[in-house]
């Protein structure tokens, strides 16, 4: 194997290994695209690794991207999940959930998904 090929292989391996340590969302309730018949009491997020609670938050937005509230996430009995308790019931409409956490390597991880509440 040539030196260039070895360096390329090592670089590709490093990129793959770095990506393995990044946290990502596995599941959420309400889930992406879900239509609910009533307001949820909380937003619950599950990750592939334990989220860093001090760096985890959920921002709830209206469909037009106007902010409703940012909620500090709290730990749950499942170490891979966090909950964001809603301060009051949501009226019918379309919503966006912006979540943020950190991987154990310190990288900030973010995501957005939407859900609806039917009238």
Positions of PLM-derived features:
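Extended, polar beta-sheet/loop recognition surfaces of beta-rich domains
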Residues: 36-38, 42-49, 106-119
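Short, exposed beta-strand-loop hairpins at the edges of beta-sheets
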Residues: 87, 98-112
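Aromatic sugar-binding surface patches on proteins
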Residues: 77-84
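Bacterial N-terminal signal peptides
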Residues: 8-18
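Solvent-exposed serine/threonine-rich low-complexity stretches and specific carbohydrate-binding patches
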Residues: 68-77
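A glycine-anchored, Pro-Gly-centered beta-turn/N-cap motif
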Residues: 39, 86, 91-94, 100
């Amino acid at each position: 194997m040539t030196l260039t090929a070895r360096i390329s292989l090592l670089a590709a391996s490093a990129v793959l290994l770095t990506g393995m340590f990044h946290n990502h969302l596995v599941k959420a309730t309400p889930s992406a695209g879900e239509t609910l018949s009533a307001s949820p009491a909380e937003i619950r997020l599950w990750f592939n690794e334990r989220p860093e609670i001090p760096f985890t938050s959920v921002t709830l937005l209206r469909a037009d991207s106007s902010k409703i509230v940012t909620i500090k996430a709290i730990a749950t009995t499942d170490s891979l999940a966090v909950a964001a308790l809603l301060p009051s019931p949501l009226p019918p409409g379309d919503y966006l959930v912006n979540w943020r956490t950190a991987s154990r390597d310190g990288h900030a991880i973010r995501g957005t998904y939407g859900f609806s509440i039917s009238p």
